[in-house]
Amino acid sequence: MLAYPVSSKPIDYSKPTFIQPKLDGVRCVIQSECRGSSWVIKAYSRTGKEWKNINHILAELKPFFQKYPKVVLDGELYNHDLRDNFEKIISLVRKTKPTDEDRLEASKKTQFHCYDVIFEDKNVLYERRRGFLGDHLYYGYKTINIIDNQIVNSDEEAQLYHKINLEKGYEGSIVRTNDPYQCKRSHNLRKFKDFSDAEAKLTSWVEGKGKRIGTIGKFIAVDADGNEFGMPVMDKFEYLQKNFKKMQGWIGKTATFTYFERTKKGSYRHPLFKAIRDYE
């Protein structure tokens, strides 16, 4: 989810303000589309790529879209049990020609976590959109989840809920103001996050040392500003060993990585490879 940091602009807590967990999932918007005389339900990534291995989710939403064909659901493909295995979520949803086995596994492990809805009337405030989701999608679904929201009245209260979200294993928190939906990054969404995400192009790799010989120890990468840095790879040894050759082929691709903060000179503190950004 694209969002500015909480610190980017003061928040007016005298107006309705909400906080929710920030998921480390794959962005997904779901909508109903008219095809001739019938309607079909489709799911897309942030960049418009169609997700083709979540038929179980689309089937479960069919009655909802029959009743509300002109709304769009905004959320993420996620499973909190896989919160430490982002690559698994990606591998399940990115398949363009899923087999029956792929669909079966996805049906067991992939869920849609909805955090907003888009109406034809773009002036609808978040408090009403939140109420709509609670009324129509909160109960009776197996793979559809509505992101939990809490009303907060101060930065101290928001920080408290953020701490709780971290303790529950979420990657951070999102603060929402009571404003209309924006189809772009806006100050209506702010993020509390101890680590940040960024993207950089992989230019080379360095083999691991000691017990990590035969695996990628780190990638060398260059960000959009031309800063070159090392991007360590931390994953299970078995996975790294099995995919040693495959990962060497990632050179030239764009990767997502996490980092704690940036120095005054623009360097990254504690950067870690997260995933290849070719799934959206």
What are the residue ranges of the model-derived segments?
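N-terminal, charged amphipathic alpha-helical interaction modules
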Residues: 143-146
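Short helix-to-loop capping/linker segments positioned immediately adjacent to catalytic or ligand/cofactor-binding
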Residues: 100-104, 121-123, 148-153, 158-165, ...
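Phosphate/adenylate-binding "loop-and-lid" substructures adjacent to NTP/NAD/dNTP-binding pockets
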Residues: 1-9
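Amphipathic alpha-helical
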Residues: 148-196
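Classical nucleotidyltransferase
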Residues: 18-20, 26-75, 182-280
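Short, structured patches in soluble enzyme cores that scaffold and shape functional sites
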Residues: 75-77, 114-119, 148-151, 177-179, ...
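Covalent nucleotidyltransferase
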Residues: 9-141, 279
